[in-house]
A protein has these predicted regions:
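Glycine-rich phosphate-binding loops that contact phosphosugars or nucleotide phosphates
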Residues: 33-171, 276-278
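Short helix-loop-beta junction
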Residues: 53-66, 217-228, 291-292
Length: 331
């Protein structure tokens, strides 16, 4: 994905959340029944990460929530099925139609005009996508699913007022990371500057933050940066192998690893580790990573007054997306 497209996609995260908040406030989800089980159907990696984040965040869920690529055999009239896709021509349209035929309540995050939307029945709740948005968003999927699940009394995590507050926080993050703000005052540019020219491991502890770490790695790969998402525990377990070798640490001003090859058999690109976390967990994560000068902790939600798990996750996701957009810039 080119830098301009990355920038536009990152800037739209708040708008996607706002669409979910408006849908909840306008009563779009009010007729959803309390389900026996919830199934999140998706074939896409970003949407799947959003689905995994929903499951991890909704610790108070009153019904089991599962993720699937196809419709499970058990799904029937007592269940609630979500379809999450960016592709309006996705074959997942057949799943949506089959869920409706079985009598399940269905929710579609609108991918735009095409077979998927056409497969929605009059009973399907269709969550609108912001105007001029070509793709879905991690934050938008999380907000839409949690807004619907809150209305269906599965969780209390995502009422309309909370989603609106989260959208405000994400919009404020987008302003702070806007292209007209330079390196001195732009936290996303500062993050990108630190990562540029490195292979990056993004780590997050626990199921929620592992999904954010994997999302960050996906954004960075879109920007052309080698990246991997994992847990803090797994990163620490591998720290001996990840640490720069003494030979690689020797600073040869005339050595270019992209032209001359790795130093003494070292890596083609130096390694950086970034841990993403919540304000509550940041002190502990910083303490664990303090011995490693090639690692840093990023906690964008520390700068936000509103304290809520959705704020922590969505503001971090917004900064990750903005930072990825700036990686291709010249240092």
């Amino acid at each position: 994905m080119d830098p301009h497209s990355l920038t536009l996609t990152a800037a739209a995260e708040g708008a996607h959340l706002r669409a979910a908040a408006s849908a909840a406030a306008d009563g779009l989800f009010d007729d959803l029944p309390e389900p026996r089980a919830v199934v999140l159907i998706t074939n896409e990696s970003r949407a799947r990460l959003a689905a995994e984040a929903v499951i991890a965040l909704a610790a108070d869920a009153r019904a089991p929530i599962t993720i699937a690529r196809s419709l499970p055999r058990f799904v029937g009239a007592l269940d609630l099925v979500f379809v999450l896709t960016d592709d309006p021509g996705d074959p997942i349209a057949e799943v949506l139609a089959e869920a409706d035929r079985r009598g399940a309540a269905t929710v579609l995050v609108d991918p735009g005009e095409g077979p998927v939307r056409a497969a929605a029945s009059s009973r399907t709740v269709v969550v609108p996508r912001p105007a001029m948005s070509a793709v879905g968003s991690f934050c938008g999927y999380v907000g839409a699913v949690l807004g619907a699940l809150t209305a269906a009394r599965v969780t209390a995590l995502g009422p309309a007022a909370v989603l609106d507050d989260v959208a405000d926080a994400v919009d404020a993050e987008a302003v702070a990371c806007a292209p007209d703000r330079d390196l001195l005052v732009n936290p996303a540019r500062q993050w990108a500057e630190w990562m540029r020219g490195h292979s990056v491991v993004v780590a997050g502890e626990g199921d929620v933050w592992r999904t954010v770490a994997e999302l960050a790695a996906a954004w960075l790969l879109d920007a052309g940066l080698p990246a991997h998402g994992t847990t803090v525990s797994d990163m620490l377990r591998a720290s001996g192998a990840l640490a720069p070798s003494p030979a690689a640490a020797l600073d040869d001003l005339f050595h270019d690893p992209l032209i001359d090859g790795p130093v003494d058999g070292g890596r083609m690109l130096p390694l950086s580790v970034i841990a993403v976390t919540s304000p509550a967990d940041a002190p502990a994560v910083r303490a664990r990573l303090e011995p490693f000068e090639w690692a840093r902790v990023e906690c964008p939600a520390e700068e936000v007054e509103v304290r809520h798990p959705l704020v922590d996750v969505c503001v971090t996701a917004a900064r990750v997306a903005a930072a990825a957009a700036y990686v291709p810039e010249e240092g």
